[in-house]
Design a protein with these regions (language model features):
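Conserved alpha/beta-hydrolase "acid-adjacent" motif
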Residues: 324-330
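Conserved alpha/beta-hydrolase
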Residues: 178-198
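Short beta-strand element of the alpha/beta-hydrolase
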Residues: 155-163
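Catalytic histidine-centered segment of alpha/beta-hydrolase-like enzymes
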Residues: 350-364
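Hydrolase active-site cap/lid region
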Residues: 246-300
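Short beta-strand/loop motif that positions the catalytic acidic residue
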Residues: 310-312, 317-319, 323
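Alpha/beta-hydrolase active-site loop
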Residues: 203-224, 230
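N-terminal targeting or regulatory segments adjacent to alpha/beta-hydrolase or S9 domains
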Residues: 1-130
Length: 375
């Protein structure tokens, strides 16, 4: 009898441990599958505001606070725009002073917590940039997809699509440049975004199903006069662009791809986000399996460039070694495998999805050179 009881207790313990591991894997996978738009990814540190004065802001000294370039600074109920580090401004050893360009809304005071975001602009193109725009609804398979349309004289449209941790406001970073060069721009909100249809299962599929909303945007553009389209995607938006270029029924109208911090291995990205939530390394494979079970995502035999061997249109990739969410090495592999089609522009000291922010002028010059033959 004692043996039977001991065996039953051991079995119960094993079952309990297994259930706990499954639950832990499921929770860890939420870091990617339930990443809310417009909120910081777990890889992005919170910074403390130490004070503001005369066009300057003092932040906790951190590698993030030392990044070069121009960023949004978001807190709970506030948004500001910060410029480069002011190395000559007086500061203590544990702080950093950056240029404070503007406070878009809310207030920033000592003790506030905030994070850097690639979203420099908030609102809409008319309010943030002074560009005439129209709010349009794009018919999608799950319902109407809200988008901003900024008109331009050319018949090649740029369709911009954001990725993890951001919103369609991210497209405004390059919208002024595109408008100066007379490109019509369509900035898309897709399933799971504010105002867009809900995802059927409530989960982010990291571009693997969301690309169909981008396909709907391509169809809308062609119906409304676009002869060709260039897809400009950030993060999982870049994944969507690659999928649409390969599978859209109108892929012959896609003349170029701009891929910023592309997620080329969803498993690697999921592991990175789960690890940033302090998931123990031993549980990371469970997070991947949980994600597969919840979403039906395929095994990551796509970690390298092989799925894109059939790429038939030119692509410009903006990426760099400081991206801890979507490793740069996969972009390097893609560029090395397809030098005939893929140009890699390497950006240093920039986090995921923020290649423009690190050096807007250089980014836009590379973009101009790429787009010129496609005009």
């Amino acid at each position: 009898m004692r043996t039977v009881k001991a065996a039953a207790a051991a079995a119960t313990a094993v079952i309990g441990a297994g259930a706990a591991a499954v639950a832990a894997g499921r929770f860890a996978s939420d870091a990617a599958l339930k990443a809310p738009p417009g909120r910081p990814l777990p890889t992005e540190p919170r910074l403390t505001v130490h004070g503001t004065a005369a066009g300057q802001i003092i932040l906790t000294r951190d590698l993030a606070a030392l990044r070069p370039g121009r960023y949004g600074l978001s807190g709970d109920g506030s948004h500001a725009v910060v410029g480069p580090v002011l190395t000559t401004a007086p500061h203590t050893a544990d702080t950093v002073v950056r240029r404070l360009e503007s406070v878009t809304h809310g207030t920033l005071k000592a003790g506030d917590k905030a994070w850097l975001t690639p979203n420099v602009y908030v609102g809409n193109p008319s309010a943030a940039l002074g560009l005439d725009h129209a709010d349009v609804d794009i018919p999608g398979e799950l319902g109407a997809l809200p988008a901003w349309f900024v008109p331009g004289a050319r018949d090649t449209w740029v369709i911009a699509v954001h990725g993890l941790g951001t919103t369609r406001e991210l497209a405004m970073n390059v919208m002024e440049f595109l408008h100066r060069n007379r490109f019509p721009v369509l900035a898309l909100a897709y399933r799971g975004d504010l105002g867009a249809p809900r995802r059927p299962d409530g989960l982010n599929h990291l571009g693997e199903t969301e690309w169909r909303d981008l396909d709907a945007a391509i169809r809308y553009a062609v119906r409304n006069g676009a002869r060709q389209v260039v897809l400009h995607g950030w993060s999982t938006g870049a994944t969507m662009a690659l999928r649409a270029a390969a599978h859209s029924g109108l892929r012959d109208r896609v003349s170029g791809l701009v891929l910023d911090s592309p997620v080329l291995s969803w498993q690697t990205t999921l592991r990175a986000l789960a690890a940033a939530r302090r998931t123990p390394g031993v549980l990371l494979p469970l997070a991947v399996r949980a994600a597969q079970g919840r979403t039906g995502l395929y095994d990551d035999g796509v970690a390298g460039p092989a799925p894109f061997d059939g790429l038939r249109i030119p692509a410009l990739v903006f990426h760099g070694p400081d991206d801890t969410v979507a490793p740069w090495r996969f972009s390097r592999h893609l560029a090395a495998a397809r030098p005939d089609m893929v140009a890699l522009y390497t950006v240093g000291k920039a986090p995921h999805g923020a290649m423009w922010n690190a050096d807007p002028q250089a980014y836009e010059e590379a973009l101009r050179r790429f787009l010129t033959p496609l005009m």
